[in-house]
Amino acid sequence: MAAYFTNRLYFVRHGETDWNVAGRLQGQRDVPLNGRGRDQASAVGRLLRDMLAANVAELDFVASPLQRTRETMGLLRVAMGLPADPFAMDDRLKEIAFGRWEGRTWRDIRKSEPATAQARDADRWGYVPPEGESYAMLAERVKPWLSSLEGDTLVVSHGGVARVFLTLLGGMAPGDAPTAPIEQGRVLVFEAGAARWV
């Protein structure tokens, strides 16, 4: 897919939540930003404003519909000198679904379900958590969205989506993507088959 992607994509992971701090798997649960997360969203908006300057008006803005991404998008847009909305939302940009594991920590899962935790560790890209989805399934969900992009786009989404983008657009091997660190308060730029953090 990277060979066919000619636009520039600015990826922002949502700001911090209390579940991030606690190490809980959020998945598709609707968890709000905490104070630090709101500060991160505003800071990344200022970074984008300075980085993009006159090109801001040419961007398409799209977010996952979950609360933490909508909040992040609104705050960063205000920091960029834009109204908090409107911006588009797309269900395909929701976080990877962890199913029955949502709300739990990896430590708890490893303790209570060691066999399933080991199965996931053996194939992090292809493993499907109970009632959830794999990274491979998430990749199939976001491919049509990527193919639909017509111009440079700023997207606010989730760590799992960023890992899939690293594989589809940034040349990362699927086996490496599930453990790639995806930071909050920074911008991941995809362009010409490569990815770089700003």
Predicted regions and their residues:
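Phosphate-handling substructures
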Residues: 22, 78-141, 179, 191, ...
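Generic beta-sheet signal
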Residues: 9, 59, 151-160
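General small-molecule cofactor/ligand-binding pocket signal
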Residues: 10, 62, 88-90
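Short active-site segment of divalent metal-dependent hydrolases/proteases
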Residues: 17, 161-162
